[in-house]
Amino acid sequence: MMRHSSLRLIIGGLILLLFVLNVFSKEQGSHSHKRSHSAKRFSRDSNSARERRPNIILILTDDQDVELGSLNFMPRTLRLLRDGGAEFRHAYTTTPMCCPARSSLLTGMYVHNHMVFTNNDNCSSPQWQATHETRSYATYLSNAGYRTGYFGKYLNKYNGSYIPPGWREWGGLIMNSKYYNYSINLNGQKIKHGFDYAKDYYPDLIANDSIAFLRSSKQQNQRKPVLLTMSFPAPHGPEDSAPQYSHLFFNVTTHHTPSYDHAPNPDKQWILRVTEPMQPVHKRFTNLLMTKRLQTLQSVDVAVERVYNELKELGELDNTYIVYTSDHGYHLGQFGLIKGKSFPFEFDVRVPFLIRGPGIQASKVVNEIVLNVDLAPTFLDMGGVPTPQHMDGRSILPLLLSRNRAVRDNWPDSFLIESSGRRETAEQIAESRARLQIERRNMKLANSSLLEDFLEGAGESTTIVSSSSTAATLMSSTAQQPEDGEEEVETDNEEDDVDGDGAMDSSAAALEEDDLDDAAFEEGDEELDQEFQQNNDLPLAPYITKMMRLNSECSDPALLKNCLPGQKWKCVNEEGRWRKHKCKFHLQLEHQLAAMPRKQYQRNCACFTPDGVVYTKIRAPSAGLHRVNKRTHNGPGRRRNKREVFHTELPDEMEELLDLHQVVDQLVDHTHRSKRDLPASSNETIAQVIQQIQSTLEILELKFNEHELHASNSSGNSYERGEKYTKSGGHRCFVDATTAKVNCSNVIYDDEKTWRTSRTQIDMLIKLLKDKIGKLKEMKKQLRESNKQALAAGRRNDNRRRNDQSVLDSGAGPEFNMSYFTEISSTPRSNVVGQTEVFQGYGSASAFDSLEQTQSHRFTPRAECYCEPDVGENHADSKEMAREARRKLKEERQRKKERKRIKKARLEKECLSEKMNCFSHDNQHWRTAPLWNDSPFCFCMNANNNTYSCLRTINGTHNFLYCEFTTGLITFYNLTIDRFETINRAAGLTPGERSHMHDALDQLKSCRGRSCSIRRHQNHLEGGSSAPLLPINQVHRNNKRKHSPLAGAVGNYAFVGPRLDMEALPPIKRRKLSKYNRLTGSQQSHMKRRPWKQTPLQQSPRFLRTHSVTPAQA
C-alpha cells in the first residue's frame, strides 16, 4: 500500500509538473507574440509601418486660377494626377491673399485664429514664429518620424534669418516670389542667385533640389517616410518664363469669361462701383499677362513629371500621396479689374486640387468642399498622427478612401471666406492703443532699471556685451535681400501684394502711424536698424540709446577689420564714437579717395623768381583756417569757398570794406525789383559805390605793393626786415600819413600764425570786393541798356577810365602781385622730391579778374618753388578727405534714388488715390520675353474698404455666396442661376433668409477647432425646401470619367458638363448610367439622356427667382 501511495504521489507530481510547464510555455509564447506585435506596430522602420505611413508630396503654386482655365494648359499634370487620381471640383481658399492663405495651409487654421491678416501684418513676425509656426503640419510629422523638406517660396516677409521648426531640409525663398535675382536660405546658408537661366531659374532649381532630396532620403533610409513641399513661384509676378516657352500661348482668350470687362457694377462694393470699363491698352495687357502666366506654368508642368518619374524609379510611386493645389486664385479683367486677387468671387477663391496616391481610385471626381485649412489635418491623417484640437480643418481622406455614404452626407457644405485685414471696432482700436502705450511705458521702466544694473554690476555688463557681440557677429555674417536692392536688377515691384495692404483697416493704420512717430533713427544707420529688426531670432538686447548698441556691437573684433569678401558691416571709431559702414561702399570710397585732388600747401616750399625775389610757402596748421565751412554758389557751374576769419582787430580800411559789402548787398536786393520800378538815380548810386570800393581797394593794393618792395630789399634775412619799423597799431600793418609807406608790426614777421591771419583777411576781402565789383558792373550795364535816355557817353567813358586806372598802371606793370593771395589749387601735387612747382593766382569770374590775370601772365615772370620731401598728409586732412568722399558717395546714391523716385512719381501721378492701392506698368517691369512694348498705364485695383466676411454654401439644393462688408453693404449671389456672380440679389432675400445666413456667418467668424465644421443640412434655410436641382455644372459624386486630349479640353476649361443628382428622386425616375465609350473618348456619353418631368413642388421657391433687381433695390 505504501508503495502504491508513493507511486501515485510521484505520478501526480509529474503530471502537475508537466501541467505547470505547459502553462508557463504558453504564457511565454503569448508574451513574445505581444512583444513582436507591439514592435511591428510602433517600429518606424518595419515593413508594416512603411505600408501604413506613405510618403507625402505637396506641390503648391502661387496665384494659379481655375476659372480662367490655366490648369488646362498643363497636360502632364492632368494626365498624371487628375487622370491617375482624384479631382476636387470645389476646392477653395479661405482668404485670397498670399501670406494669410499660406499661414492657413501650414497651420490648418482660419485667419481670425492664426492672426496673419495681410502680407505685411504679422506675416512671419516674432509672434507668428513663437506661437503658430511651431504647430505646423511639418512639426507633427517630423516628430512622428518623417524626413521633411521644404523648397520654394515660404511666406512673403520671411527674411531668411532662421529655419522654421519641423523642416530637416530647408531651401526657403527670402521675401516674395522671384524667378531671377533672388536669395534663398539653404539649410542656414544664404545663397544669392543672379540672372543666368542655366544656374538661377528658380522653378527649375526647386525641382532639382526636390529630386535630390528624394534620392538622398531613400539612400540614407529607404524605409523612412518622406514629407516634401515644393512651393513654386509660378505664375506669380513678374511672370518670367523659361526661354524655351516664351513663344507659346499667344492669343489665348480663356480668361474672357462673361464677367470680363463687366464694369461698372453699381450693385457691388465701392471699388467695383467706381471701376470703369477697361481701355484697349488694358485689354492688351490682360491678354499678354495671361500668355506669360501660362508660359511660367510650363516649368511647373515639367517638374511634376520629373518628380513622378523619380518616384517611379525609386519604387515609391504606389506608396506616395501627391497633392497639387494653389494658395489662391486670380483675376484678369473680371469686373473691369485688370489683375490681382483679394475678392470673394470664384475666380479669386477657387483653386485647383488634384491628388493621387494609394487607395485613391483613378479618374475620380469629388464634389464635396475641400479647403486650404483641410490640408494640414489631411497630411497628419496620412501619417497616422491624430489631428490637434486647435486645427479648424478636417482630413479629406474619408472622402477618398471610404465608400460609406454617411461620410458624404455629413460633410460640411458651408465655409467662411475672410478678406485680408483687421476688423476691430472703435473700442478695440482704442484698447489696442492704450495697451501699446502701457507696454512701451513698461519697457522704458524695465530699460531704466536694466541700465542701473548695467552701470552697477560689472558681471552683467560683460554678459550684455557678449550677447550683443554674438548678435553683431550674426548680423555681420548675413546679407539681407531687401537691403541689396540697389545693386540688383529690380524685376518685381511686388504690386501684386499691394492688395493686402489696402485691406488693412483703420486700427492697423493707426498702430503703424504710432510706430512711425517713435522711429527716430539717424540717417546714416537707418538700414542697420531695419536689418536689426528683421532678424527675429536674434537676442533682443534692451539698449537705451543707439550709441550703447553700437558700442556693444562694435566690440566684436570681426567688425574692426577691413572689409573682406562676404563681410557686410565695418565699425569705424570717429572722434570717440563708433559708426557702422556698409562694406559694399568700401571700394567705391577708396576709388573716390584716390581720385580726389590733394592740397598743394602740404609741404614747406621756397620760391624764387627770375628777378631774384625769394618767398616761402609754409604749410598751414592742421586745424588751420582752410577748412571749408560753407559753400556758396557764385553763378552757374562755379563754386567758391568762404572761410570764417576770427579777428580781434581790423584796419580801418577793412572795416570800411565790410560796410561797403552791406551796401552792395542792399543794392543787389534793390535791383531784384522790376526794371520799370527802378528810379533813374539807381545808376548814379551804383557808380558811387563802385568808385568807393575801387578807392579802398587801391589803398589795400598799395599796402601790399610796399610790402613786396620791402621784401625784395631784405631778402637775405626775412626775419630782420621787420626791425626797421617801429611797432604801432598792434598786430597789423598801417600806412604812414607822412611818408605814405606801409609800416607793419614785428609780430607779423615773427609769428607765422599772425602773419597768415592778416594775409588771409586781406585776401578774403580783396576777392570779395572783386566779386562785388563784377556784380555791380553787370547791374550797371543792365540799367544802362534799359535806360537809353539817361546815361551819357561821358559818364561811361569816365567809368571805363577809372576801371583802367584801378587795374593797370600805364606801362608800369601791376601794382599788386596776386601770387601772394593764391588759393588752394585743384592740381594734384606730385610725390617727386625736389620737383619744381609753380603756383599761380586766380581771381573771380568777372571781367576785372580775367583782365588782371591776363596782365599778370603778361608782365609777371613765372616763379620756381622747391619743396621739402613729402612726409604724408596729416591726420586732419585725411579725415577731411574721407569725409568729403563719403559725402560725394552719399550724394550720388541720393541722386540715384531721386531719379527712381521721380520716375515712379511720374508714372503714378495720375493713378494715385487716397485709401486705394494702385500700380503702374511700363516697359521696364518685365525683363524677359515676351516684353511689354505698349504704352505705360496706371490702375487702382483695390481699396481699404474692401474688407468682408462671406458665407459660401454648396450642396444639393443651394449654391450661393453671402457677404457682409465693413461698410454695411450686403451682397448675395445665387450661383445656381448666375454662375459668374454678375448680379447682386441681396434685395430679393426675405428677412428670415437674411437672418439665418447672418447667424451662420457670425458662428463661423468666431469658430475654433471642431466648431468651424458646419454639418450638411444644418445650414439649410428656415422652412427648408428640398429642391432636387443641383448647382449648374454639378457632377455625380462617385462618377468615374475620362478626359479628352488637351485640344478638346481647352475649350471646356471648367466643369465637365451638367449633371443631375438623382439620389433625391425616386428610383423609377432615375436615369440609367451607360458605360464609358472608350472608342470615341467622348465626355458627353456618360448618361443616356431621357426626358423626364419635374413637378412644381420639386423647385425651390427661394433661390430660383429670376426677377431682375430694380434700381431702387440696388
Swiss-Prot record:
Compositional bias per record (Polar residues), positions renumbered to this chain: 1095-1114
Key words, A-Z: Calcium, Endoplasmic reticulum, Glycoprotein, Golgi apparatus, Hydrolase, Metal-binding, Signal
Signal peptide positions (record): 1-25
Biased composition (Low complexity): 466-479
Entry's EC annotation: 3.1.6.-
Alphabetized Pfam families for the sequence: DUF3740, Sulfatase
Skewed-composition ranges (Basic and acidic residues): 795-804, 876-895
Molecular function as annotated in GO: glycosaminoglycan binding; metal ion binding; N-acetylglucosamine-6-sulfatase activity
Residues that coordinate or bind Ca(2+): 62-63, 98, 327-328
Modified residues annotated as 3-oxoalanine (Cys) in this record: 98
Active site: 98 (nucleophile)
Residues carrying a glycan: 122, 159, 181, 208, 251, 447, 683, 713, 743, 817, 945, 955, 974
Cofactors: Ca(2+)
Gene Ontology annotations for the cellular component aspect, listed alphabetically: cell surface; endoplasmic reticulum; extracellular space; Golgi stack
Xref: CDD domains: G6S
Biased composition (Acidic residues): 483-502
Post-translational modification: The conversion to 3-oxoalanine (also known as C-formylglycine, FGly), of a serine or cysteine residue in prokaryotes and of a cysteine residue in eukaryotes, is critical for catalytic activity.
Location relative to the cell: Endoplasmic reticulum; Golgi apparatus, Golgi stack; Cell surface
Free-text comment on the cofactor: Binds 1 Ca(2+) ion per subunit.
Region (Disordered): 466-504, 781-812, 876-901, 1073-1114
Membrane spanning residue stretches: none
GO terms of biological process kind: heparan sulfate proteoglycan biosynthetic process; motor neuron axon guidance; negative regulation of canonical Wnt signaling pathway; negative regulation of epidermal growth factor receptor signaling pathway; negative regulation of smoothened signaling pathway; positive regulation of smoothened signaling pathway; synaptic target inhibition; wing disc anterior/posterior pattern formation
Protein family according to the UniProt entry: Belongs to the sulfatase family.
Protein name according to UniProt: Extracellular sulfatase SULF-1 homolog
Source species: Drosophila melanogaster (Fruit fly)
Gene: Sulf1
